[in-house]
């Protein structure tokens, strides 16, 4: 099992995800989106694992202006704009190989063990 958690250090759900894997003795790699961000390859792989980049968008993101711009763009521009503005991601994004989840999803992670 190769768990990656993408999130921010201040996100409550990201902290809960880290605690979930720590309590079960499962090793994971934490990637802070504010410090490092997601590479284009990681973004594409995560989007594929989730069934589309649309699932990464947090409709409650604080950056309302960029969120509104994302809605106004044509489909082929939206994916690139989201990649450029990773503060719009819903977190945590948890990846296990070709599987992935967005948000706190322990019922799905349980099946990964």
Predicted regions and their residues:
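Thiol/selenol-based redox catalytic cores and closely related redox-interacting motifs
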Residues: 33-113
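Local sequence-structure signature of Cys/Sec-based thiol-disulfide redox active-site neighborhoods
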Residues: 1-24, 28-33
């Amino acid at each position: 099992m190769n768990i990656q958690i993408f999130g921010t250090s201040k996100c409550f759900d990201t902290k809960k995800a880290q605690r979930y894997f720590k309590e079960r003795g499962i090793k994971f790699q934490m990637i802070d989106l504010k410090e490092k961000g997601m590479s284009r390859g990681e973004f594409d792989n995560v989007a594929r694992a989730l069934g589309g980049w649309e699932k990464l968008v947090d409709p409650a993101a604080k950056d309302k202006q960029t969120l509104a711009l994302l809605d106004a763009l044509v489909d082929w521009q939206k994916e690139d704009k989201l990649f450029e503005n990773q503060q719009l991601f819903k977190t945590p994004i948890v990846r296990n190989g070709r599987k992935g989840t967005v948000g706190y999803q322990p019922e799905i992670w349980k099946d990964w063990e």
